[in-house]
Amino acid sequence: SAVAVGWSGYASGLLTGFGIDVPQMLPFGEMAGHALHFNPLAVFIIFAVAGLLILGTRESAWVNSALVVLKIAALILFLVIALPAFDISHFTPFAPFGWGSTPTETGVNTGVMAAAAVMFFAFYGFDAVSTAAEEAKNPGRDLAIGIIGSMVICTLLYMAVGAAAIGAMDFNAFAASGEPIAEIVRSLNQPEAAAIIGGVASIAIPTVILAFLYGQTRIFYV
């Protein structure tokens, strides 16, 4: 659900660029004094990915591979655009919110430890590769390569994209954005590239949802 909500931010921005206004949140009522909201785009993508999985494993794997290639290409495009605008002064002070986890007046935890908790979530899901053991020809070798290899590649990409993003633009300017990568590229006077990155994100981010749903079906089967 968290990935689906994140995807809806990029999808909403992309649709807005085409003159289509689809709200990310619709009022859904109230519970215990808190307003409830409904995210139509997030619900749509979950059902769309579930429909793809129903078609079969082979079809899902082919689509997933193609989308991962697109996703990596978009990140490389971002690095090519952002790195020339890198400004080391954006890293000063290096840890403006401290090294601990300090709640703000709005209740949001800030600091290195709070960020580490979010990054832990970013690594959640690599174990889903193990649920595909039944389809692997040599699971003892293939699963080790799949899990460790994907973690190494993703870690390097996380570090490179994070450093390039902060170096190209002050983090306060994009921290609250629903499409931060595209927002940074747009601020560098590259609207076409921003549209491409936003479009690829809208298409490729659902691969994460696909991996989770695929793994869940195998867990239920066992």
Describe each region flagged by the PLM.
Residues 19-44, 69-198:
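Helix-loop-helix junctions that connect adjacent transmembrane segments
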Residues 51-57, 134:
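Structural signal for the C-terminal ends of transmembrane alpha-helices
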Residues 1-46, 51, 202-222:
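Hydrophobic transmembrane alpha-helices that form the core helical bundles
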Residues 1, 5, 63, 146, ...:
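Non-catalytic, surface-exposed connector residues within folded enzymatic/regulatory domains
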Residues 63, 150, 203-206:
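Loop-to-transmembrane-helix entry motif
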